[in-house]
């Protein structure tokens, strides 16, 4: 829970208020290039991992620990990749060819089909976000209250950071607030584990808060763009 000021009191004093719940889906990753990794041993005796990844240093650490070898024995090369959007912020295809090459000394590669990539990648976190907002007679937004319920799926990778950004990146857009509150819960469910996805939680939160501000502007009979111009930092 993060709170500044007395949200309930300020909202009760606002001339215009809105309360609405918004739902965002667990969109699937569909980067053009699927997960793929090639491995070989170099002339220094190092395991070279050539991978379509967004996290080369994490891959180096993970492969080293999986094989129980020092990180100095692993070199990760990250070429220009054909899209990642957050899906490749998880180690997916690197471990198996790394094991094969380290055990046999021979080159190896692993290329995922589109179907395999969709099974193994991490979709966006599904969220249910409740927003309360209030403004005075001049259209100045005085209070924002955001509660996010995030579905992380079967495992909690990126769960605490993405849900945090749903509030931190949305409430902060408005500079005249006298009070704000942000609270969240994350739940495990028996579905595909969610992870990093473009916007990283901010997308869901901003969609909800901006939708609430649009509805608030409609109540006030004002242009939503005008309301946002009046309330956002210059």
Question: Where are these predicted regions, by residue range?
Answer:
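Structural alpha/beta core scaffold segments of enzyme domains
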Residues: 1-234
């Amino acid at each position: 829970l993060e709170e500044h000021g007395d949200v309930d009191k300020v909202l009760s004093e606002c001339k215009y208020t809105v309360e609405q719940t918004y739902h965002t889906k667990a969109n699937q990753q569909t980067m053009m290039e699927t997960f793929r990794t090639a491995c070989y041993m170099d002339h220094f005796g190092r395991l070279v991992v050539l991978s379509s990844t967004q996290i080369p240093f994490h891959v180096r650490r993970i492969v080293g620990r999986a094989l129980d070898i020092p990180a100095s024995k692993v070199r990760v090369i990250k070429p220009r990749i054909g899209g990642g959007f957050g899906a490749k912020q998880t180690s997916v295809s690197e471990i198996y060819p790394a094991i094969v090459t380290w055990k046999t000394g021979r080159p190896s590669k692993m290329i995922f089909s589109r179907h395999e990539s969709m099974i193994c990648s991490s979709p966006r976190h599904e969220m249910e976000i409740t927003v309360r907002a209030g403004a005075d007679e001049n259209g100045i937004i005085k209070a924002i209250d955001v509660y996010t319920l995030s579905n992380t799926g079967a495992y909690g990778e990126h769960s605490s950071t993405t849900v945090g950004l749903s509030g931190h990146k949305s409430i902060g857009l408005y500079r005249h607030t006298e009070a704000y509150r942000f609270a969240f819960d994350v739940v495990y469910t028996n579905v595909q584990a969610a992870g990093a996805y473009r916007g990283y939680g901010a997308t869901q939160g901003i969609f909800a808060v901006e939708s609430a501000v649009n509805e608030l502007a409609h109540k006030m009979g004002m242009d939503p763009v005008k309301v946002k111009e009046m309330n956002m930092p210059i």
